[in-house]
């Protein structure tokens, strides 16, 4: 299933190209709606292999759209000269939230006799809905500034780069070996 989870990341190039005229805020909102659909599919559909893979793909498309927009929005809404700090804060709070979520899942599945997958997917869908409605509060209309560089590689952002590498490596290890 790792292939099907990562396939939307590759498709993201084409998705973003097709919707290049939309603002980062609008794309982030679209990603939230797609993520909610995918998580809702996990919660409501029977757990057959094909439907589970379809739900993973739908959720992952939304997640990849949001991943692409998080940095853009963090930089856009940051105070002047504080873009790196904003990205670092956003990334670290994301990491902490993910870690807390993993610990809750581990504790629940250790303490409970039956494995309440449907309940957790339902709860995740509710949280995705809350997140989606929060994202609808974004009102800005970002536009690409053609006078600025597209990629930033600066020494002062080293911590941010390391956090992103840690996030990707941790996620790959967990998704590869977590089911076993």
Which residues fall in each region the model found?
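Hydrophobic core of transmembrane alpha-helices in multi-pass small-molecule transporters
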Residues: 38-39, 49-66
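Intracellular juxtamembrane helix-capping segments at the cytosolic ends
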Residues: 65-78
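C-terminal membrane-cytosol helix-exit motif in multi-pass small-molecule transporters
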Residues: 105, 109, 125-144
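Transmembrane alpha-helix termini and helix-breaking/packing motifs in multi-pass membrane transporters
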Residues: 1, 13-21, 100-121, 180
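Juxtamembrane intracellular "pre-TM" segments in multi-pass secondary transporters
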Residues: 137-169
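Helix-loop boundary and gating motifs at the non-cytosolic
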Residues: 1-10, 156-180
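Glycine-rich segments within core transmembrane alpha-helices of 12-TM secondary carriers
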Residues: 87-105
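C-terminal ends and interior cores of transmembrane alpha-helices
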Residues: 13, 33-47, 110
């Amino acid at each position: 299933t790792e292939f099907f989870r990562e396939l939307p990341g590759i498709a993201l190039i084409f998705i973003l190209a097709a919707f290049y005229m939309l603002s980062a805020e609008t794309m982030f909102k679209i990603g939230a709606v797609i993520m909610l659909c995918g998580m809702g599919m996990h919660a409501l559909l029977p757990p057959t292999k094909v439907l589970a893979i379809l739900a993973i793909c739908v959720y992952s498309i939304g997640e990849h759209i949001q991943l692409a927009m998080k940095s853009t929005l963090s930089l856009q809404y940051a105070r002047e000269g504080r873009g790196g700090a904003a990205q670092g804060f956003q990334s670290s709070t994301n990491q902490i939230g993910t870690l807390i979520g993993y610990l809750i899942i581990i504790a629940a599945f250790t303490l409970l006799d039956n494995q309440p997958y449907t309940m957790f997917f339902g709860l995740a869908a509710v949280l995705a809905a809350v997140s989606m409605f929060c994202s609808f509060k974004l009102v800005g209309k970002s536009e690409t500034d053609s006078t600025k560089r597209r990629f930033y590689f600066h020494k002062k952002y080293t911590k941010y780069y390391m956090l992103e590498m840690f996030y990707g490596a941790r996620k790959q290890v967990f998704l590869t070996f977590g089911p076993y």
